Amino acid sequence: MDSSSSSSSSSPSSSYGVARVSHISNPCIFGEVGSSSSSTYRDKKWKLMKWVSKLFKSGSNGGGSGAHTNHHPPQFQEDENMVFPLPPSSLDDRSRGARDKEELDRSISLSLADNTKRPHGYGWSMDNNRDFPRPFHGGLNPSSFIPPYEPSYQYRRRQRICGGCNSDIGSGNYLGCMGTFFHPECFRCHSCGYAITEHEFSLSGTKPYHKLCFKELTHPKCEVCHHFIPTNDAGLIEYRCHPFWNQKYCPSHEYDKTARCCSCERLESWDVRYYTLEDGRSLCLECMETAITDTGECQPLYHAIRDYYEGMYMKLDQQIPMLLVQREALNDAIVGEKNGYHHMPETRGLCLSEEQTVTSVLRRPRLGAHRLVGMRTQPQRLTRKCEVTAILVLYGLPRLLTGAILAHELMHGWLRLNGFRNLNPEVEEGICQVLSYMWLESEVLSDPSTRNLPSTSSVATSSSSSFSNKKGGKSNVEKKLGEFFKHQIAHDASPAYGGGFRAANAAACKYGLRRTLDHIRLTGTFPL
């Protein structure tokens, strides 16, 4: 994996959840006695009528004299919720028929009293009064009939308020979710606003979503192919993310020949084409805006950086040639160079101290079908007139990156011209990276709107690039690129470039650049 990329995994359960509809229910009807209660009442009534018929038969066969008997109708005692008769008269004063009649009244009264003990809130289902208890003809006292209670309204269905329209749901189907009820048409997706009619939906807190809407909101998409990033074998969403640009992409794009910008390291999106240089490198559109592609075009920037050194009292007395070269020419020069430390897979700059013949880019290429073509080169013999033969920089890089490379290589030249010998790579590369970082910082801070930003160096950055000022300042895109190049220097993982920069920058911030350089001259190390 690329050193500037990072891997991240997330479980779908943390960003994508599926919940089922709690229930879909038919309307609940309260306040009716079920069929079991009705059948029990009918059975009791049938048994009572059967007993009464037997009683009448026995009375007609063995009836008394028919003497008049005082009959006391049953009374209802409201406090006790029961029915009981008054004490009967002496048996000696009544005939057998009168006694039987009184027994019948007592039995019916007790049966009706039993019905009055039903739990409060129950009623009866009426069907043309077939089940309505009524007094019997043949002497049954109508005053003994006690009508049933009316249904209690407090046991009707519980009122449900719709969580969508805040009105009563009433009868009909309804949905329940997280303790809240909805009309079916009021249960809507929090993202698109349309009703959720599927059996499954997604929840984020208490907010419902269509599954697809929730996936669009939470499931990461690849910024290269613009598809949802797939899950791996463990069911986790695995993707790569650039540490500075936060560009998320599928892991497969690291080995499927997707183009990567040689300057900012961003991958080429499928809907935006990169430019291809003649040596095979790719350049994004933003980096292409300020790319420097030939030696003549780079001369103003080179002299501006020399002026920057002079402004810090580090003037380079020798005129060191500077050439923009192709990748192949730079690699060949590295092979012939005895001095120097190079850790990067692709070296983008070199400070020569040996005599060599180098092919430089004399005329910039022209644009054609997303390619730079028609570049003119020229071999050039470099002779050694001092400790430094020449400075070589890779062509086709944006202005700020080209300047950062020049500032780094010029520091190598300054060290050699000022008698710094046999420095270990961590010290030499580290202090050169500090000068590169300082120049980038001065370029980013040169805009008046950002002058209040803190500086990581104690050295004043009053010398700004006149080359940039002639162009009317830098765009926000170029400033963002400058921040990225600073980020690259500060977070380099190599011991010489990254570790050396952090040690050198700490010393320069604590003691100042001049005292740090004096200590390096005497001891070959950074001051602690």
From Swiss-Prot:
PTM field: Polyubiquitinated by DA2.
LIM zinc-binding domain ranges (all copies): 160-220
Taxonomy, superkingdom: Eukaryota
Expression (tissue specificity): Expressed in the vasculature of leaves, inflorescence stems, flowers, hypocotyls, and primary and lateral roots. In roots, expressed in phloem companion cells.
Pfam families named in the record: DA1-like (PF12315), LIM (PF00412)
Residue ranges with Low complexity bias: 455-470
Bias (Basic and acidic residues) ranges: 91-106
Keywords: LIM domain, Metal-binding, Repeat, Ubl conjugation, Zinc
GO BP annotations listed: phloem development; regulation of DNA endoreduplication; root development
UniProt keyword Hydrolase, yes or no: no
Keyword Kinase: no
Protein's job: Acts redundantly with DA1 and DAR1 to regulate endoreduplication during leaf development. Together with DA1 and DAR1, modulates the protein stability of the transcription factors TCP14 and TCP15, which repress endoreduplication by directly regulating the expression of cell-cycle genes. Involved in root phloem development. Is an essential component of early phloem development, long-distance delivery of phloem content, and proper maintenance of root system architecture. Involved in the control of root meristem size.
Subunit-level organization: Interacts with ubiquitin, TCP14 and TCP15.
Identification of the protein by name: Protein DA1-related 2
Organism, scientific name: Arabidopsis thaliana (Mouse-ear cress)
Taxonomic lineage: Eukaryota, Viridiplantae, Streptophyta, Embryophyta, Tracheophyta
